[in-house]
Regions:
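Flavin (FAD/FMN)-binding glycine-rich loop and adjacent Rossmann-like elements that form
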Residues: 1-317
């Protein structure tokens, strides 16, 4: 709380736990946020208003981040047509509500609704803090107030996105677990049903205090991959002794690191197509999905022009 006295307590949303040991497991998952559609058109923007339970102290750490000289506030205002943005998290203190989602994967629908509301309160409070608090540098604040929620988007929900960005939650432990070695093509993936190509990208999972008294974000990863990689059919199906006739194209059998790349929407569409094809073949043959012959699935996917293997071309890929 007092930057001159490490024993004075912790600021809001700073964990009192230590960083995890290498190789150890825990319940922490990468942070969630709402991806917002903003506009700087004077006739199509809604100013950022004060949330009902707003508490400026929740953003004390951000005030200190600004005081340190940080200025990357607009780095994820990705522009889309009609003077709008797809605005996402960026930087040490941003729209990601770090630590606010640990209970989400196994929570009831009622508890999940509470967690989603907490994220909304946090993020709307953040916007109001940046727009109004005197600790925000005036040049950044002036530029920030050129923006607002797009008035013609999400008109039935106060111009706020309906869906929280659930980057990761539960993951299955199936017949094959995709890992970093697979994504980096360091081992042969069996029975490919599609490919991924995005960076191994995961957001922070916690914010804690280092021994010297400084706050540290932990969990952010951004590792490029050399070439597109294969995704195994066996990572879409559970172990036969645990469950049959279930295909899982989203919460796939994967390590956290590998899922950082697999979790992209185009990959989900690719795996969804392959899972649907496997389901049809299993029904036609009256067999469990674990009993489906891969060569038959491969033939059908090839006929449907699903890309199952990376073939390098002279002009790149």
């Amino acid at each position: 709380i007092n930057p001159e006295d490490p024993s004075s307590g912790l600021l809001p949303n700073v964990s009192g736990m230590e960083a995890g040991a290498y190789g150890s497991a825990d319940k922490r998952i990468q942070a969630y946020c709402f991806r917002m559609c903003l506009s700087n058109h004077p006739e199509n923007k809604v100013p950022f208003t004060k949330p009902e339970n707003y508490d400026a102290y929740q953003y004390e750490l951000l005030g200190r981040v600004f005081e340190s000289g940080w200025r990357e506030l607009f780095h994820k205002f990705d522009h889309i047509p009609n003077r709008k943005t797809d605005t996402n998290n960026h930087g040490p203190f941003s729209t990601d509500f770090i630590g606010g989602n640990y209970e989400y994967p196994e929570a009831s629908y009622q508890k999940r609704a509470e967690i989603i509301q907490n994220h909304k309160d946090y993020q709307q409070g953040l916007l109001y803090f940046i727009a109004t608090d005197p600790r925000v540098p005036i040049d950044l604040q002036t530029k920030f107030n050129e923006w607002g929620l797009a008035a013609d988007e999400f008109t039935d929900n106060g111009n706020w996105p309906h869906q929280l960005y659930i980057r990761e939650a539960r993951r299955m432990i199936g017949e094959y677990v995709m890992t970093e070695k697979d994504v980096l093509t360091e081992r042969q993936v069996p029975e490919s049903v599609g490919m991924g190509s995005y960076t191994m990208d995961s957001h922070n999972a916690q914010r804690y205090v280092k021994p010297g008294g400084f706050v540290q974000n932990e969990g952010d990863i951004g590792v490029k991959i050399p070439v597109p990689y294969q995704i195994s059919y066996r990572s879409l199906i559970p172990k036969a002794e645990e469950c049959t006739n279930l295909l899982v194209p989203v919460c796939v059998s994967s390590s956290h690191i590998a899922f950082g790349s697999i979790r992209m929407e185009p990959v989900f569409m690719i795996l969804g197509q392959s899972a649907a094809t496997a389901a049809v073949l299993a029904m036609e043959q009256d067999v469990d999905i674990q009993q489906l012959a891969y060569h038959e699935l491969q033939e059908r996917l090839d006929a449907d022009q699903q890309v199952l293997i990376y073939e390098k071309k002279e002009s790149g890929y």
